[in-house]
Regions:
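Glycine-rich, proline-tolerant flexible connector loops at the mouths of alpha/beta enzymes
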Residues: 34-59, 74-76, 108-113, 183-189, ...
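A short, GP-enriched loop/loop-strand-helix hinge that lies immediately N-terminal to
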Residues: 67-71, 101
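Active-site mouth loops of central-metabolism enzymes
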Residues: 5-18, 71-83, 154-164, 219-226
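Glycine-enriched alpha-helix->loop->beta-strand junction motifs that scaffold or abut catalytic
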Residues: 31, 62-65, 96, 174-181, ...
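C-terminal amphipathic alpha-helical "assembly" element
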Residues: 1-32, 101, 182-184, 188-199, ...
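N-terminal beta1-alpha1-beta2 module of alpha/beta enzyme domains
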Residues: 1-67, 158
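Internal, glycine-rich beta/alpha segment that forms the wall or movable "lid"
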Residues: 78-178, 189-196, 200, 204-209
């Protein structure tokens, strides 16, 4: 099971950039897999942008191995044009020499009338990366032939996730051929329910529609303690592929963040 970090960008307690750099470089030295930057959520559940992509662009030049995860809110065209996302993501992937992961964050439950636009946005994004020259015609959009550059370093494209907090989100990730990142913070029973919804939905789709490899990750709180070790053992035994541990906006600040990073990378926490 991969071990990764989660920063929420845009919150009042967002760390100073040099502090974050120090923490991420420590994580890279200790073998942590990915650092994810997500926008913070408001009281109404909507996401504040917070410009995670800018933070990741800066991290790309200050790190060498650790992968860079971008949590992108509101990927429902035309509110966020897929072409701009394709360009920004490819630029980060190039500057990091192929280390980008992209997780799409719904602003709310995916309503039935939004599903077609959301699915179409994902397909447009993938085609912009894959095709030498992009064009698109549908009842919603008409895009004449255009060069979408740059292209990402990873082929055919960076791994794509749907981040969500319900069984419906998990099923949408499976049906869309994406990886799924559970940000519900639920109990193990809830996490397993979401995982099973994802696995069942993904098993029923055409292999040609798979966008990314099957993967199910969870974002969580985790203290450096024996209880934390037991929780990691439990999640790994349940078959989760990646765990993201929050290291921003902690009561203990930078010291607590470094403690969590060292714990996550320790031999005690690496079960198998």
């Amino acid at each position: 099971m991969k071990r990764s970090l989660l920063y929420q960008i845009g919150a009042a307690e967002t760390p100073e950039f040099e502090t974050m750099i120090e923490e991420v470089q420590l994580a890279e030295t200790l073998g942590i897999d990915t650092v994810w930057c997500f926008p913070s959520a408001g009281e109404d559940g909507s996401f504040r942008d917070g410009a995670p992509s800018i933070w990741l662009s800066a991290l790309a030049s200050r790190t060498e191995r650790i992968r860079l995860g971008w949590g992108l809110a509101g990927m429902t065209p035309p509110s966020r044009p897929p072409m701009r996302v394709a360009e920004q993501a490819a630029a980060i992937d190039l500057s990091s020499e192929g280390r980008l992961e992209l997780a799409l964050l719904p602003d709310a439950e995916l309503r039935q009338d939004d599903e077609g636009a959301w699915d179409e946005g994902v397909r447009m994004l993938v085609d912009m990366w894959d095709a030498p020259r992009f064009s698109w015609t549908s009842p919603r959009f008409t895009v004449p032939p255009v060069d979408v550059v740059p292209k990402p370093a990873q082929h055919p494209h960076p791994p794509l996730w749907l981040a969500g907090w319900s069984a419906e989100h998990a099923a949408r990730a499976g049906e869309g051929g994406l990886a799924f990142l559970d940000i519900s913070g639920g109990t193990d029973q809830t996490l397993v329910l979401h995982r099973d919804a994802y696995t069942e939905a993904r098993a029923g789709i055409d292999p040609n529609d798979l966008v990314s490899m099957a993967s199910c990750g969870i974002a969580t709180e985790l203290d450096a303690s024996p209880d934390g070790v037991e929780r990691l053992i439990g999640w790994e035994d349940l078959g989760f592929d990646e765990v993201l541990v929050r290291v921003s906006s902690l009561e203990g600040g930078h010291a607590e963040a470094c403690e969590r990073i060292r714990f996550l990378a320790s031999e005690d926490a690496r079960v198998h």
